[in-house]
Amino acid sequence: MDQSNAPQPSRGAGLLLIAAIFALALNLRPAMAAVGPLLDLIEAATGMGSITASLLTTLPVAMIGVGALSIRPLRRRLGERKGVLLGAVLIGLACLARAVFDGTAGLIASAVVVGVGVALIQALAPVVVKRAFPTRFGTVMGVYTTGIMGGAAVAAATAAGLAEAVGWAGALALWAVPAFLAAVVWIVASRAPAAEEPNRAAIAEGTHPEVPFWKQPRAWALVPILGLGTSAYTLVLAWLPPYYVDMGQTRATAGFLLSGMTGAEVLAGVLVSLFIARFPDRRGPMLMAVALALVGLAGLVLTPVSLAVPVMLLLGLGIGAVFPLTLILAMDQIDDPVRSGDLLAFVQGGGYIIASLSPLAAGLLRDRLSDLSQAWMLMGLGLVAMALMTLTFRPGGAKLR
């Protein structure tokens, strides 16, 4: 399909669609990011240990992966517009349920539902972006990933204060409000002609020869790249605040440090969206981002308190750039927006299942060693491996089918 001939939204409709994409993105991480700063309260109230508590991050991330692998039949049945809407509603309902079902079982169940909702949006929204903005795809994806990081930053910064005002369960449940608001904005914005999906029968039957991604080694190579890059994000999202609380910092301080780091991630996302068009070879920006993240992880081990602010800045800039770059790298491999959406679902499916293991492994290390330093060091090795794999994706190389 020639994307240049696809219907382009008017300026007003395009801005509204970008606003809707941004609003949806803001809701993809708060249900997880708000947990870390409140983890000691949650553990005290429910009796959870570190391994069980890690499931509040591990399960949503794993469900994102499982949901992504199932997204093609869901898209055939629901369509992109309804699928994204369902995702936002599920996130809202899961957050709201935490005000009522605040025991261990209820929190774990809500984590699963959050993961399904996030999976729907993360697999389908980029397809809409690529169709509606074919010539500005990298820029709009930068806006999208900036929204993801921004939502996490706000959730981390406000968690402790909200918990003091309405309790930890209420602080988690309040994130239902922006999720439902995003659903309303999406209902309006997704009516733009360029946001409409192609005929579902065409999707089901296929309009061009396809080779299953599981038969293409290049597609498999993208899975650990996204998985390891996302592992760094999920690891710090889950365990950075408890790491600082364990070292004697207050809950509010730990939350603000996570917020500062995610604020740096927002800045990185903005920079990627502004400048990625100048780098058709994604390897250079990726290597720079990994280097920043490695220095930040080293700082967490060596100088976590005395140099906390620069450590958060470096870590956030690195991880915040790695995340959108991995998505853009994957979407670069196929021109057709529907087929590229299928690729992203495949890559996110395996990648997020890999990423779900990092918070769980860190919880195990914390229970056994009462320290998370080893988790940061292992993550650093993972990022080095990811960077080496990225080097094989040179511009002009063979694309996927």
Q: Where is each model-derived feature located?
A:
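Conserved MFS/SLC helix-loop-helix module at the cytosolic interface between two early adjacent transmembrane helices
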Residues: V66-A105
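Helix-to-loop junctions at the C-terminal end of transmembrane segments
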Residues: G67-G79, A268-D281
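Intracellular juxtamembrane helix-capping segments at the cytosolic ends
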Residues: L120-F133, A321-D335
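Cytoplasmic helix-loop-helix junction between adjacent transmembrane helices
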Residues: S110-G147
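A late C-terminal transmembrane helix in Major Facilitator Superfamily
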Residues: I334-L372, M379
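Helix-loop-helix hairpin linking two adjacent transmembrane segments in secondary transporters
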Residues: T135-R136, V143-A194
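Helix-breaking motifs and short loop linkers at transmembrane-helix boundaries and internal kinks
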Residues: G47, G79, V100-A105, P134, ...
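Extracytoplasmic gate region of multi-pass secondary transporters
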Residues: V35-G36, P217-G269
